[in-house]
């Protein structure tokens, strides 16, 4: 033991060190354990349990992101609906379904109902311009096999039948509304999923050190020296690892910098907090069973897309509305108010300044959102639930998101990215994940990409096993309707998503 991180003794040697006990590390750990059972793994988590930050079910919307209802994945370009991003995200979510199904068949995952449940996905349009867009979006997707049984209606009676809670008190004569929907959607509890993975990992011999914060990563010969602080005793310990994965959410960028990963030079992070309104009133819950996504206001960022969601957590249904944007300098929900200021360095200050100059719309959105009180938030809720009673709803703080700011040439100098960015060094012995949505939903696809980048020499040897995990590996399901249908039926059954 040592009270100084610089003199911390190396007390263990492992093949793989996983930093952060969220869904990212859980997934990569499960993959590597199956591919190389003899490789030792160790997990470090600064909190006292798994999946307590972004993976926690009330810290995210739990949407199984497959672009069935999220309108920002089907932008309009030159008068046409571009579905390429929707197809890409849908394809990756099918990889998730296959991987989870395989883990259930292997007994690694044990209870699908604890982490995934069928919930219809609905797109909601208000006003003639949005309704026209939604109809054209529906026309662009309806015949694609990746979007099964999608339907559209601008009929008031159908709206009332499908969305009774959203119909109460609504004046259908004052504004045109329309919906498109599919019963192929899901609600996912990524916290429960991560916990099942880590339970299996611990049983297989993986050491999980909760209450340990990794404070330094340095190269020592052919290995990485990973130094962790025991947050309960204040002592420091070090381990040697051949491969390091940094799945530390908003703290990933700083750790990759400490490791000397040149690929993050110039990168910065923009923290965005959020709030939800939550209701557990059974009278409301029984009147709404869907994830309903609307369209962001003109000029507003993608993160501002409002949605009214059914959540299934620990077997209990609840309703979540939001997110309402907020701002905090923290890079984790349980982080420090100094996080943002500590992240500013000579190599990324121009990236920060460039984004500050460009993103007026984002700044205006965040300022407006921060100034909203509870009553103002309920007013926004009433666009979806006109009869909303403030007494039925409570405020819940969402997980902290850190959007990636990539360096760019003049005159921008910095580019704000909405999505997930995988980083690795040229040697492929350290990797990390930056960014936010739709990360959790497509984690298996991200980790397959990581394996290809960092363990390329092993991929031929691992090929058959990866094909077992993900039967469609190497094939684009968007180009193979027969295989898509086979995989859909297989995962529907294994994940217990079939209607009864």
UniProtKB/Swiss-Prot annotation:
It catalyses: (S)-malate + a quinone = a quinol + oxaloacetate. GO terms for molecular function: 2-hydroxyglutarate dehydrogenase activity; L-malate dehydrogenase (quinone) activity. Its cofactor is FAD. InterPro entries: FAD/NAD-bd_sf, MQO. The keyword Oxidoreductase applies. Keywords: FAD, Flavoprotein, Oxidoreductase, Tricarboxylic acid cycle. Its EC number is 1.1.5.4. GO terms for biological process: tricarboxylic acid cycle. Belongs to the MQO family. HAMAP family: MQO. This is Probable malate:quinone oxidoreductase. It comes from Corynebacterium aurimucosum (strain ATCC 700975 / DSM 44827 / CIP 107346 / CN-1). The lineage of its organism: Bacteria, Bacillati, Actinomycetota, Actinomycetes, Mycobacteriales.
């Amino acid at each position: 033991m040592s009270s100084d991180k610089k003199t911390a003794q190396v007390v263990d040697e492992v093949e793989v060190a996983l930093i952060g006990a969220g869904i990212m590390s859980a997934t990569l750990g499960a993959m590597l354990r199956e591919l190389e059972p003899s490789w030792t793994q160790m997990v470090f988590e600064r909190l006292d349990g798994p999946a307590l930050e972004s993976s926690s079910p009330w810290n995210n919307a739990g949407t199984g992101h497959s672009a069935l209802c999220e309108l920002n994945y089907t932008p309009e370009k030159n008068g046409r609906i571009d579905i390429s991003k929707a197809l890409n995200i849908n394809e990756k979510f099918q990889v998730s379904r296959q991987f989870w199904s395989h883990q259930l068949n292997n007994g690694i995952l044990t209870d699908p109902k604890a982490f995934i449940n069928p919930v219809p996905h609905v797109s909601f349009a208000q006003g003639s311009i949005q309704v026209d867009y939604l109809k054209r979006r529906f026309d662009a997707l309806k015949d694609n096999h990746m979007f099964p049984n999608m339907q559209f209606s601008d009929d008031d009676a159908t709206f009332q039948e499908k969305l009774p809670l959203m119909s109460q008190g609504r004046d259908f004569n004052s504004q045109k509304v329309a919906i498109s929907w599919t019963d192929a959607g899901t609600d996912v509890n990524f916290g429960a999923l991560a916990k099942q993975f880590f339970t299996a990992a611990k049983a297989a011999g993986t050491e999980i050190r909760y209450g340990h914060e990794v404070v330094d990563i340095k190269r020592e010969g052919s290995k990485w020296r990973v130094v962790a602080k025991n947050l309960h005793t204040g002592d420091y310990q070090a381990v040697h690892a051949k491969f390091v994965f940094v799945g530390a959410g908003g703290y990933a960028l700083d750790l990759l910098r400490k490791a000397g990963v040149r690929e993050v030079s110039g990168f910065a992070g923009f923290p965005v907090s959020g709030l939800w309104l939550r209701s557990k009133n059974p009278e409301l819950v029984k009147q709404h069973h869907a994830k309903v996504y609307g369209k962001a206001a003109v000029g507003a960022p993608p993160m501002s897309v409002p949605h009214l969601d059914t959540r299934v957590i620990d077997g209990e249904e609840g309703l979540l509305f939001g997110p309402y944007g907020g701002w905090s300098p923290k890079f984790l929900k349980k982080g420090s108010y100094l996080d943002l200021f500590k992240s500013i360095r000579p190599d990324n200050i121009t990236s920060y300044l460039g984004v500050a100059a460009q993103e007026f719309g984002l700044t205006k959105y965040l300022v407006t959102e921060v100034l909203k009180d509870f009553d103002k938030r309920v007013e926004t809720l009433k666009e979806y639930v006109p009869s909303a009673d403030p007494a039925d709803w409570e405020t819940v703080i969402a997980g902290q998101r850190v959007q990636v700011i990539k360096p760019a040439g003049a005159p921008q100098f910095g580019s704000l990215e909405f999505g997930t960015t995988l980083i690795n060094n040229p040697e492929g012995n350290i990797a990390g994940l930056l960014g936010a949505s739709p990360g959790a939903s497509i984690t298996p696809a991200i980790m397959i990409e990581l394996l290809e980048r960092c363990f390329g020499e092993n991929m031929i040897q691992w090929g058959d096993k990866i094909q077992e995990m993900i039967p469609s590996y190497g094939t684009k399901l968007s180009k193979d309707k027969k295989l898509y249908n086979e995989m859909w039926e297989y995962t529907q059954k294994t994940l217990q998503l079939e209607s009864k």
